[in-house]
């Protein structure tokens, strides 16, 4: 497409593209916007090497002038986006690119794969951590991830979503995600007996001993050996057994029985961690059943978002600039949900006096919502359903993040993004955060934007009718 734009003399024709999604994975009430800093890093380095251009030349089908154009290519547009870590909802632009058409199209694939993947994993992590009710959750999924990049960037997204740490050491090297690890069954099996394995591990890591106790039998072997280790190895060193991990069996029964026996041995401070195919629903059930669990290691169902492994974000043109004038664009479809909302836009989040989010309003870019006057919300699919709100304040969510070849906002740390997620979640009503059958959060259109969309749809309908 970029080559076609160039050969048609449209290399400097500017457009606006919106990134948004149509439904929340797992029928949830919200999503977490993640991956923005990764996109900005890509934009910063985006260029074409001589080898890449030669490959395109040999492949054929590319205009030589276009190949020369790529030699000096740098992204020359603007990017507007929600803050990374924001809670977001369907059918509102999370990121808008305003740039020459070629620039917009070249960004598309990387932008989609990055924001879709990281938003998916961050959203899944937030759901899982919410069900843990303050207990620590660890990301254990690298070995089941869909490749090395998915493991690495998945760990980043999971940390943003709320996990305490990851078993992916490279994620700490690259992003600063705290790395953790425990022993594997192979370590236990490599010794003559379980106790010898535990003793060797404790001698190596006396300050951080966490034992995997289900290699043979949790209650008849693993736990008794763990208690013996505390008494015979760690206690003489002035150390304490940090924890045990159970990776199989009835986790509710085993954790409760282990807790009883640990407490009876004076090991009330020894934590119990579990793993084994966990997700938000299983964690919720374990806690409701009274399981004595202090932490959860969550693997494949987090790192692959196994229950719904696709975040359906799309990237659509909404405006084209000709002779200095913006011309809104709309795509219609047999499926109503796929009809786009035209024009360069802003998203306003409305908060009540208690700082709880009450609705998002998608408006034309030039509109302002300031809360000084009552404001009427309406359902864009059923405009007769209206509600007037007052005593609120409105926050513009799409902020300029890239201009003139550089980022224009201070780069947040990953810990700051993670903390922002929690502050955002605190603005949502419990009904919106319900695991099942959540209340639908309102995303409305402003009256001028709704009018524009309807006028364009009516115009297209008339053209189609006249063309019959």
Language-model-derived ranges and their functions:
Residues 1-13, 27-28, 278-468:
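Gly/Ser/Thr/Ala-enriched C-terminal appendages of enzymes
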Residues 181, 273, 294-297:
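Short hydrophobic alpha-helical runs that function as membrane-insertion/retention elements
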Residues 54-55, 123-127, 141, 433-440:
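Short coil/turn segments at secondary-structure boundaries
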Residues 79-85, 394-397:
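Short acidic, Pro/Gly- and aromatic-enriched capping/linker segments at domain boundaries
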Residues 1-14, 23-25, 61-62, 67-76, ...:
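Buried, small/hydrophobic-residue-enriched core segments of structured protein domains
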Residues 1-61:
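Intrinsically disordered, low-complexity, positively charged segments
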Residues 182, 234-243, 269-271, 430-440:
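Flexible, glycine/charged-enriched surface loops at secondary-structure junctions
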């Amino acid at each position: 497409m970029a080559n076609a734009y160039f050969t048609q003399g449209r290399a400097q024709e500017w457009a606006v593209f919106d990134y948004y999604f149509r439904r929340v994975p797992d029928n949830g009430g919200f999503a977490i916007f993640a991956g923005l800093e990764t996109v900005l890093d890509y934009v910063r380095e985006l260029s074409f090497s001589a080898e890449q251009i030669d490959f395109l030349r040999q492949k054929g089908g590319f205009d030589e002038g276009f190949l020369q154009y790529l030699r000096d290519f740098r992204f020359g547009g603007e990017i507007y986006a929600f803050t990374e870590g924001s809670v977001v909802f369907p059918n509102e632009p999370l990121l808008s690119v305003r740039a020459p058409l070629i620039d917009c199209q070249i960004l598309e694939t990387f932008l989609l794969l990055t924001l879709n993947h990281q938003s998916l994993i961050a959203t899944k992590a937030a759901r899982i951590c919410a069900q843990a009710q303050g207990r620590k959750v660890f990301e254990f999924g690298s070995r089941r991830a869909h490749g090395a990049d998915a493991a690495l960037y998945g760990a980043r997204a999971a940390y943003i979503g709320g996990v305490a740490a990851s078993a992916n050491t490279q994620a700490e090297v690259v992003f600063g995600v705290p790395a953790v690890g425990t022993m594997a069954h192979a370590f236990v099996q490599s010794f003559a007996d379980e106790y010898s394995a535990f003793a060797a591990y404790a001698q190596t890591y006396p300050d951080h001993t966490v034992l995997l106790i289900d290699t043979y039998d949790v209650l008849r072997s693993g736990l008794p050996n763990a208690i013996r280790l505390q008494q015979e190895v760690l206690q003489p060193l002035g150390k304490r057994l940090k924890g045990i991990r159970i990776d199989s069996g009835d986790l509710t029964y085993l954790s409760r029985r282990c807790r009883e026996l640990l407490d009876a041995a004076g090991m009330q401070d020894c934590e119990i961690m579990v793993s084994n195919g966990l997700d938000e629903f299983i964690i919720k059930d374990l806690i409701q059943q009274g399981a004595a669990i202090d932490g959860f290691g969550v693997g494949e169902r987090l790192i692959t978002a196994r229950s719904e492994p696709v975040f359906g974000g799309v990237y659509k043109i909404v405006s084209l600039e000709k002779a200095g004038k913006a011309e809104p664009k709309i795509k219609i479809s047999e499926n109503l949900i796929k009809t786009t909302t035209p024009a360069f836009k802003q998203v306003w989040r409305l908060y009540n006096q208690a700082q709880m989010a009450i609705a998002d309003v998608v408006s034309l870019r030039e509109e302002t919502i300031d809360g000084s006057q009552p404001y009427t919300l309406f359902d864009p699919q059923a405009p007769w359903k209206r509600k007037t709100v007052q005593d609120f304040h409105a926050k513009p969510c799409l902020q300029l993040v890239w201009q003139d070849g550089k980022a224009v906002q201070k780069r947040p740390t990953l810990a700051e993004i993670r903390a922002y997620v929690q502050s955002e979640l605190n603005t949502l009503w419990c009904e919106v955060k319900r695991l099942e059958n959540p209340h639908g959060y309102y995303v409305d259109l402003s009256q001028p934007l709704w009018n524009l969309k309807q006028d364009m749809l009516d115009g297209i309908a008339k053209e189609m009718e006249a063309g019959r």
